[in-house]
């Protein structure tokens, strides 16, 4: 019996998980998404061609991989169908859990309307309806992908839901679709998606029993976890390794190696605490060189220095076996590079994450920069200062680096 390896982001998302998964996919039979929705975005570069994936696992770019969208994901049929249209021959290579919850048009309308009402206190969501979809799931009023197999019945259930919540929709100025419009959409979803809908948990159990190689692909980052992130500025699902198992129906004994994906600096989209944010020239330089624009939202990411306190925290949360250090090349040409080794909090120096992270100040140490690592594929060819930087990050995080990315391209990766 084999075990499922897990790839997990350990900052605020956008760490480069897609590139790592894409690089590793050739060694796996199954690649699986476990949580989130189309608020997540993976960018993968292959031979100069850019692929942006939001719902589909990154294994879709490898013909031998079977790709699974698990029960913990909230699925927008509209978005998924559009994404599927980019690829050929998906039959037998893509499966969607019949237990995954649906993310429908009204969810995004609710999301946008509620954010608008909050004004300056808005969370800074993607507006994709992810929170409202998970809210329906927790309230036990949601609908699941398996219900698409009976579109007439699902349509009737949704119309009843809309009528029961008519006052709520009117307050948010959201127009309720007609039964005819809704049924037409559901029938279209049914026609296209039915061949892909199945019990993916049983499929994975069988795969592990048959010693197949399985990779679980995390979405977003551990600092956005609903329980362990910077609440309330978090996502609506569990983004840590334990959540990856839950979101696919696997048990803790079925977890294999856990690899944490981390940028050589730090970024964050939206509002919320971000201790190492640099609002000056260095932060702007990182943003420009790193092309730090959100894949799903098009929003500019906030940029700053490596936060070793946060990474050490998320390394423990996830039980990491190794790190994959991404976008090291973005720091090429910096004379000095900062690392946050601790925080100042209420007059004390601390090395942990308090629940009110917005009240800390970073304590930095500086290291000498380097000229260029871009495109290097051999560790021995890295500049000495880059090697020292990597060694210091390992020391502060308490986890060894196994992979180093030196450009957006798939093959520009050092494996240690």
From Swiss-Prot:
Gene Ontology cellular component annotations, sorted alphabetically: cytoplasm
Location relative to the cell: Cytoplasm
Q: What class of enzyme is it?
A: ligase
- Residues where Mg(2+) binds: 14, 41
BP GO terms, sorted: 'de novo' AMP biosynthetic process; IMP metabolic process
Q: Where along the chain is GTP bound?
A: 13-19, 41-43, 301, 327-329, 405-407
Which reaction does this enzyme catalyse, per its entry?
A: IMP + L-aspartate + GTP = N(6)-(1,2-dicarboxyethyl)-AMP + GDP + phosphate + 2 H(+)
- Residues the entry annotates as binding substrate: 295-301
Which PROSITE patterns does the protein's record reference?
ADENYLOSUCCIN_SYN_1, ADENYLOSUCCIN_SYN_2
* InterPro entries with a match to the protein in the record: Adenylosuccin_syn_GTP-bd, Adenylosuccin_syn_Lys_AS, Adenylosuccinate_synth_dom1, Adenylosuccinate_synth_dom2, Adenylosuccinate_synth_dom3, Adenylosuccinate_synthetase, P-loop_NTPase
Which residues are the active-site ones?
A: 14, 42
Q: Which residues bind IMP?
A: 14-17, 39-42, 126, 140, 220, 235, 299
Cofactor(s) needed for function: Mg(2+)
Where do the coiled-coil regions begin and end? none
Bound cofactor: record note: Binds 1 Mg(2+) ion per subunit.
Give the EC number.
6.3.4.4
Keyword annotations for this protein, in alphabetical order, are: Cytoplasm, GTP-binding, Ligase, Magnesium, Metal-binding, Nucleotide-binding, Purine biosynthesis
Supply one GO molecular-function term: magnesium ion binding
| UniProt pathway | Purine metabolism; AMP biosynthesis via de novo pathway; AMP from IMP: step 1/2
Role: Plays an important role in the de novo pathway of purine nucleotide biosynthesis. Catalyzes the first committed step in the biosynthesis of AMP from IMP.
Assembly description = Homodimer.
Report the family membership: Belongs to the adenylosuccinate synthetase family.
HAMAP family per UniProt? Adenylosucc_synth
Q: What is this protein called?
A: Adenylosuccinate synthetase
Q: Which organism is it from?
A: Campylobacter jejuni subsp. jejuni serotype O:23/36 (strain 81-176)
């Amino acid at each position: 019996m084999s075990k499922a390896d897990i790839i997990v982001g350990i900052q605020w998302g956008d760490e480069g998980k897609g590139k790592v998964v894409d690089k590793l996919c050739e060694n796996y039979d199954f690649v699986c998404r476990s949580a989130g929705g189309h608020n997540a975005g993976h960018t993968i570069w292959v031979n100069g061609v850019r692929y942006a994936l939001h719902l589909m696992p990154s294994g879709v770019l490898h013909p031998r991989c079977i790709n699974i969208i698990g029960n913990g994901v909230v699925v927008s049929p509209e978005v998924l169908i559009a994404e599927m249209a980019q690829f050929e021959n998906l039959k037998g290579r893509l499966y969607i859990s019949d237990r995954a919850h649906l993310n429908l048009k009204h969810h995004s309308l609710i999301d946008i309307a509620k954010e608008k009402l909050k004004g300056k206190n808005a969370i800074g969501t993607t507006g994709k309806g992810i929170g409202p979809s998970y809210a329906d799931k927790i309230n036990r009023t949601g609908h699941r992908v398996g219900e698409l197999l009976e579109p007439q019945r699902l349509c009737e259930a949704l119309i009843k839901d809309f009528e029961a919540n008519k006052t709520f929709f009117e307050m948010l100025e959201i127009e309720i679709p007609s039964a005819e419009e809704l049924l037409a959409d559901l029938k279209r979803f049914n026609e296209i998606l039915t061949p892909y809908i199945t019990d993916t948990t049983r499929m994975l159990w069988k795969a592990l029993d048959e010693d197949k190689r399985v990779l679980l692909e995390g979405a977003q980052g551990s600092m956005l976890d609903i329980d362990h992130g910077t609440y309330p500025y978090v996502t609506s699902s569990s983004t840590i390794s334990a959540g990856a198992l839950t979101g696919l129906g696997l048990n803790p004994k079925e977890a294999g190696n856990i690899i944490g994906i981390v940028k050589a600096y730090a970024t964050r989209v939206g509002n919320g605490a971000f201790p190492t944010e640099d609002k000056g020239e260095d932060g702007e330089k990182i943003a420009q060189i790193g092309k730090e624009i959100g894949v799903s939202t098009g929003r500019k990411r906030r940029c700053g220095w490596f936060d070793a306190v946060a990474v050490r925290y998320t390394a423990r949360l996830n039980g990491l076996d190794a790190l994959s250090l991404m976008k090291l090349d973005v720091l090429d040409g910096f004379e000095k590079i900062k690392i946050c080794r601790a925080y100042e909090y209420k007059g004390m120096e601390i090395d942990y994450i308090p629940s009110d992270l917005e009240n800390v100040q970073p304590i930095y140490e500086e290291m000498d920069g380097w000229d260029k690592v871009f495109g290097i594929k051999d560790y021995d060819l890295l500049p000495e200062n880059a090697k020292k930087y990597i060694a210091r990050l390992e020391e502060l995080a308490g986890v060894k680096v196994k992979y180093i990315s030196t450009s957006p391209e798939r093959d520009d990766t050092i494996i240690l």
